[in-house]
Amino acid sequence: MSNPPTYTTSQGCPVSDAFSTQRISGTKISIKTPVGPLLLQDFKFLDSLAHFDRERIPERVVHAKGAGAYGVFEVTEDISDICSAKFLDTVGKKTKIFTRFSTVGGEKGSSDSARDPRGFATKFYTEEGNLDLVYNNTPIFFIRDPTKFPHFIHTQKRNPATNCKDANMFWDYLTNNPESLHQIMYLFSNRGTPTSYRKMNGYSGHSYKWYNAKGEWVSSVHFISNQGVHNMTDEEAGDLSGKDPDFQTMDLYKAIEQGDYPSWECYVQTMTLEEAKKQPFSVYDLTKVWPHKDFPLRHFGKFTLNENAQNYFAEVEQAAFSPSHTVPGMEPSNDPVLQSRLFSYPDTHRHRLGVNYSQIPVNCPMRAVFAPQIRDGSMMVNGNLGGTPNYAGAYNCPVQYQAPIKASSKTPEEQYEGETLSYDWTEVNEYDFYQPGRFWEVLGKTKGEQEALVHNVANHVSGADEFIQDRVFAYFSKANPVIGDLIRKEVLKKSPRGASKNKF
């Protein structure tokens, strides 16, 4: 480097040595090196140490381990007939994006190759503000009632007594909440261990609302990998976890550095509100998928990741996504799990990053932001709107408002009238097991996939107590009795009844 930077303190004062400390001399005794105490006035050293003590911020309670990159989204087909979002209004239009991939249950230092759903969150820096599409690599989820989420996540993490993963906790919760079966079958197929973040799809899971002046539609979005979908066996994933727990993080980084830019095609399924009412399941049920034959995929775009973050902490670790970050033309649906995420995600960002997390560069909208009441707070660093009045409607600060896009009065809209009630979505019916049964049939179309599901479940549940194992066999039998029987046979082969188990 021809002109290297000058080493300074955090306040810009140049210093002569990064590694010296100020101490009292020891020349009056036989030892010639300084032996006296350090001096409190040594700002360079104490400032460095104090900052080091505060380097870590709270990790995400879920999705703690992740990787991310910047890219570009391009509109490929006109879908203005179903969505008025401006970033979609012209074929060929491009929008900058940032995508973060992650595992869900593991801590920040856990393995990328663990059997786990993958987070797939993308921030679109549009001319109407930031749009966050906070998806997963599975089209369904474990729950449909948001009150269960904290309980569920606790059972997938560590036992509060041993601080170890616990097969009893894991399967105890799931078998008591059988609406989880669809996601569990997906997770314990080889799809639960993708080889690479580049080689997996992304799904909205939730239903959303897309709308324009003509009406509104219920939508479900799919990101289909142009690299194909490639998965590992249970043994391959376990081996890679031990040899290279950061493999998928580095795989994404290296591919982009080498110019092998990963890309995904973007599709949407839509139905009208009237069609939604006629389905044999609620479109607000996160444990269900929409049949493609009835609601075909419609192509609308493509995005490519082509730029690595310059600093992992500043950009990937501090990236803050939320499904409440929307733009005109797109809204959350009444899916109760989605509704709960609208609050929970920004709330955890305020906890992890501070109330002004949207001022962090990776989270900052590309367009001008004017919300005069959002002022002050920890780490307010954007000028705080100067002397502008800190309330809307001030006599000396006129503003303009954008008129909402209203659907035609002829278009049916959701209307509600009734009393407040306490409701838990705990009822389970036969349709909750129909789609898991169909998924088993889909696995049967590819050699070895059904066997892999049975093998993967048996490997995991063998560590549980026998009464829990029996519940697991019955749980999978709800989708197809064959599945429960096959799992039972393999578990008993691995862990014969009556054999002693050292659980610790």
UniProtKB/Swiss-Prot annotation:
Catalysed reaction, written as an equation: 2 H2O2 = O2 + 2 H2O
InterPro entries found in the cross-reference section: Catalase, Catalase_AS, Catalase_clade1/3, Catalase_core, Catalase_haem_BS, Catalase_immune_responsive, Catalase_sf
Family annotation (Pfam families): Catalase, Catalase-rel
Domain of life, per lineage: Eukaryota
EC number: 1.11.1.6
Binding site for heme: Y345
Cofactors named for this entry: heme
PANTHER family: CATALASE
CDD domains xrefs: catalase_fungal
GO biological process, one term: response to hydrogen peroxide
Enzyme's top EC category: oxidoreductase
Source organism: Candida boidinii (Yeast)
Gene3D superfamilies documented for this protein: Catalase core domain
Residues annotated as catalytic: H63, N136
Descriptive protein name: Peroxisomal catalase
Family note: Belongs to the catalase family.
